[in-house]
Amino acid sequence: MDEDRAVEAAASAWPGPSRRRRLIEFLLHASTRLDLRPVVKYTALSFFADRLLPSLRRKMGFCGARGGRAVTSWLLEPLRDSNLELFALVAVWIASKIHELKPLSVKSLKALGDRIIADQHFTCRDFANAELVFMEVVEYNIGSLNIAFTYLEELLVQFREISKIGDLLNMDVCMEILDILYETEDSSWLFNSPCQLAASALVTAYAISVPKQRWEFPILPWVTFTTSYDEEEIMKVVLTILMHVLKPDEMKGKGERDFNI
């Protein structure tokens, strides 16, 4: 029994904070190099970070722990960092097929991979094989509606329709918040509730980017009304986000009155 618990703990710890952060940074860097639209970038992040990595942990038997049908491939055994970087590019490829009329070509992804994947050059055939493995691992779960960015974009559109204050809210700040949360291992759980995260990110971005003297719109009550989440639930996530996106000294002295929004 103790051995089983040890195996489960070891599996749940994979890939580890530093390795996961490097992989997310790799995908973000690739997104910049490819000049992806935000919806493609965040769909790829959702596919890779929220679906592939947890599914690999369950399926591939790290430290002997398996869950569901095993997936076998030379890309998974051994599972090198270069192979995981290939899967990150495959996530981008799949996302572009969903959202773009002219998806990224495998040749363009291979060319980028040759420049930014260390220690390994993958062929176009490898990319095609990796796509099949990716789909098997995530069990073809590539729906793109239930992601935080989609909800965030919808909320911001609604906000701007009912208040001019919405024009002061910077979407770049919203996206920077999502990037930081993706890079941080201990905040990745927030993406398990994408709609709640989107609502909380909007409130956080409002507090950060809208001048305090313009805090005339009741953003928190409006968000809770629109999403049906309790104010307390939203504020807990907002404070969690602020702890990650602001430096500790910027958080000092911020009581609830500072977030009376």
UniProtKB/Swiss-Prot annotation:
Entry's Gene Ontology molecular function annotations: cyclin-dependent protein serine/threonine kinase regulator activity
Q: Which UniProt keywords apply?
A: Cell cycle, Cell division, Cyclin
The entry's protein name is: Cyclin-J18-like
One GO BP on record is:
cell division
Q: Cross-referenced InterPro entries, in alphabetical order? A: Cyclin-like_sf, Cyclin_N
The record's GO CC annotations read: cyclin-dependent protein kinase holoenzyme complex; cytoplasm; nucleus
Instruction: Give the UniProt family note.
Output: Belongs to the cyclin family.
